Amino acid sequence: MLKKNIYKNKRFYKIINFPQVQLIHSGIFPENNYYNKENQILNKLRGKIPLEIKLKKEIEPKYGYQILDPAGIVTLTNFFEKGSLAMVKSGERNSSSTEFFFVTNKFPELDGRYSIFGKVVKGIEILQEIDKEDLIYEIIISN
């Protein structure tokens, strides 16, 4: 999806402010029937990406498994920390598709409940300046 630039010129459509952290949402609403005629990239995606978490003692990640007990959080290998990037989902655990969000600070209440797939490693201060309706111009992925 990134290689096809489907996120280019998409807006940050929701910013949720908590006392210690912000959640900054963007992506493509699946129900909007996004359809790129030239590349036929997406056509009404619904819940195609399962919840994925990685536990310390497991070799492979777990799919569709959600940690609800706070005691289980210590078994995770990835946590919501400043700059984390994760998939948005509806109430169902395997309902992620083309929407994502960033957190601007640690947010342990989300640990084990959302798939973290990236992190801002450069320019974190810019993340904290994003306003609702700002546009995505470019996404760069590095290892």
Please tell me what each predicted stretch does.
Residues 1-143:
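Cross-family detector of peptidyl-prolyl cis-trans isomerase
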